[in-house]
A protein has these predicted regions:
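Short, well-structured N-terminal submotif of metal-dependent ribonuclease cores
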Residues: 1-38, 52-66, 70, 117, ...
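Phosphate/NTP-binding elements of NTP-utilizing enzymes
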Residues: 46
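Active-site neighborhoods of divalent-metal-dependent phosphate/nucleic-acid chemistry enzymes
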Residues: 56-58, 62, 69-118, 124, ...
Length: 133
Protein backbone atom coordinates (compact mmCIF):
# COMPACT_ATOMS: atom_id res chain seq x y z
CA UNK A 1 0.00 0.00 0.00
CA UNK A 2 1.08 3.58 -0.57
CA UNK A 3 -0.07 6.65 1.33
CA UNK A 4 -0.05 9.96 -0.50
CA UNK A 5 0.98 13.13 1.28
CA UNK A 6 -1.52 15.92 0.69
CA UNK A 7 0.50 17.63 -2.06
CA UNK A 8 1.07 14.27 -3.79
CA UNK A 9 -2.70 13.70 -3.75
CA UNK A 10 -3.27 17.11 -5.33
CA UNK A 11 -0.52 16.54 -7.91
CA UNK A 12 -1.99 13.16 -8.81
CA UNK A 13 -5.50 14.54 -9.12
CA UNK A 14 -4.41 17.47 -11.28
CA UNK A 15 -1.97 15.42 -13.36
CA UNK A 16 0.62 17.97 -12.25
CA UNK A 17 4.05 17.59 -13.88
CA UNK A 18 5.59 18.12 -10.42
CA UNK A 19 4.72 14.46 -9.79
CA UNK A 20 7.73 12.55 -11.09
CA UNK A 21 7.56 9.66 -13.55
CA UNK A 22 8.64 6.99 -11.04
CA UNK A 23 6.08 8.19 -8.50
CA UNK A 24 3.39 8.35 -11.15
CA UNK A 25 4.10 4.73 -12.14
CA UNK A 26 4.13 3.66 -8.48
CA UNK A 27 0.75 5.32 -7.92
CA UNK A 28 -0.76 3.91 -11.12
CA UNK A 29 0.36 0.37 -10.26
CA UNK A 30 -0.90 0.68 -6.69
CA UNK A 31 -4.17 2.22 -7.94
CA UNK A 32 -4.86 -0.79 -10.15
CA UNK A 33 -4.35 -2.99 -7.09
CA UNK A 34 -6.63 -0.81 -4.92
CA UNK A 35 -3.67 0.11 -2.73
CA UNK A 36 -3.57 3.93 -2.84
CA UNK A 37 -4.61 5.66 0.36
CA UNK A 38 -4.56 8.99 2.13
CA UNK A 39 -4.88 9.96 5.73
CA UNK A 40 -8.24 11.59 6.46
CA UNK A 41 -6.21 14.59 7.66
CA UNK A 42 -5.28 15.25 4.00
CA UNK A 43 -8.90 16.15 3.28
CA UNK A 44 -8.85 18.57 6.22
CA UNK A 45 -5.58 20.07 4.93
CA UNK A 46 -7.04 20.41 1.43
CA UNK A 47 -10.22 22.03 2.73
CA UNK A 48 -8.10 24.53 4.69
CA UNK A 49 -6.09 25.38 1.56
CA UNK A 50 -9.32 25.94 -0.38
CA UNK A 51 -10.82 28.04 2.41
CA UNK A 52 -7.70 30.22 2.55
CA UNK A 53 -7.74 30.69 -1.23
CA UNK A 54 -4.39 28.96 -1.73
CA UNK A 55 -5.80 26.35 -4.13
CA UNK A 56 -8.92 25.91 -6.23
CA UNK A 57 -10.55 22.53 -6.72
CA UNK A 58 -12.75 21.61 -9.70
CA UNK A 59 -15.60 20.80 -7.27
CA UNK A 60 -16.60 21.70 -3.73
CA UNK A 61 -14.24 19.87 -1.36
CA UNK A 62 -16.87 17.39 -0.15
CA UNK A 63 -17.78 16.38 -3.71
CA UNK A 64 -14.10 16.23 -4.73
CA UNK A 65 -13.40 13.86 -1.84
CA UNK A 66 -16.42 11.70 -2.74
CA UNK A 67 -15.32 11.41 -6.37
CA UNK A 68 -11.81 10.34 -5.36
CA UNK A 69 -13.17 7.71 -2.97
CA UNK A 70 -15.63 6.42 -5.58
CA UNK A 71 -12.75 6.16 -8.06
CA UNK A 72 -10.86 3.88 -5.67
CA UNK A 73 -8.83 6.05 -3.33
CA UNK A 74 -8.79 4.64 0.19
CA UNK A 75 -9.23 6.96 3.16
CA UNK A 76 -7.55 5.92 6.40
CA UNK A 77 -9.32 7.46 9.36
CA UNK A 78 -7.39 8.89 12.28
CA UNK A 79 -7.76 6.42 15.10
CA UNK A 80 -6.25 6.40 18.56
CA UNK A 81 -3.20 4.31 17.65
CA UNK A 82 -2.29 6.71 14.86
CA UNK A 83 -2.79 9.72 17.14
CA UNK A 84 -0.53 8.22 19.80
CA UNK A 85 2.10 7.18 17.28
CA UNK A 86 2.09 10.73 15.86
CA UNK A 87 3.28 12.02 19.25
CA UNK A 88 6.16 9.52 19.35
CA UNK A 89 7.96 10.48 16.13
CA UNK A 90 11.39 11.46 17.41
CA UNK A 91 13.20 14.32 15.68
CA UNK A 92 10.23 15.09 13.41
CA UNK A 93 9.08 18.69 13.15
CA UNK A 94 5.93 19.68 15.00
CA UNK A 95 3.44 20.06 12.11
CA UNK A 96 0.52 17.93 13.33
CA UNK A 97 -0.80 17.14 9.83
CA UNK A 98 2.60 15.82 8.75
CA UNK A 99 2.84 13.78 11.94
CA UNK A 100 -0.61 12.23 11.37
CA UNK A 101 0.23 11.40 7.75
CA UNK A 102 3.56 9.82 8.71
CA UNK A 103 1.94 7.87 11.55
CA UNK A 104 -0.74 6.65 9.13
CA UNK A 105 1.91 5.31 6.75
CA UNK A 106 3.87 3.70 9.59
CA UNK A 107 0.80 2.11 11.18
CA UNK A 108 -0.18 0.60 7.83
CA UNK A 109 3.36 -0.39 6.83
CA UNK A 110 2.88 1.69 3.70
CA UNK A 111 5.23 3.71 1.53
CA UNK A 112 4.65 7.45 1.90
CA UNK A 113 4.80 9.40 -1.37
CA UNK A 114 5.94 12.91 -0.45
CA UNK A 115 8.10 15.77 -1.64
CA UNK A 116 8.49 17.18 1.88
CA UNK A 117 12.25 17.59 2.37
CA UNK A 118 11.95 17.23 6.16
CA UNK A 119 10.09 13.94 5.84
CA UNK A 120 12.40 12.60 3.14
CA UNK A 121 15.48 13.39 5.27
CA UNK A 122 13.99 12.14 8.56
CA UNK A 123 16.00 9.18 9.88
CA UNK A 124 13.48 6.45 10.58
CA UNK A 125 12.06 3.15 9.39
CA UNK A 126 9.44 5.01 7.32
CA UNK A 127 9.26 3.73 3.74
CA UNK A 128 9.10 6.71 1.42
CA UNK A 129 9.18 7.74 -2.21
CA UNK A 130 10.18 11.23 -3.32
CA UNK A 131 7.10 12.43 -5.20
CA UNK A 132 9.27 14.55 -7.50
CA UNK A 133 11.04 11.50 -8.90
Amino acid sequence: MIVLDTHALLWMDRDDPALGAASRRLIEDAWRAGQVAVSAISFWETAMLVQRGRIVLPLPTTEWRSELLQAGLREIVMEGRIGILATQLENMHRDPADRFIIATALQNQATLVTADENVLAWPSELLRQDARL
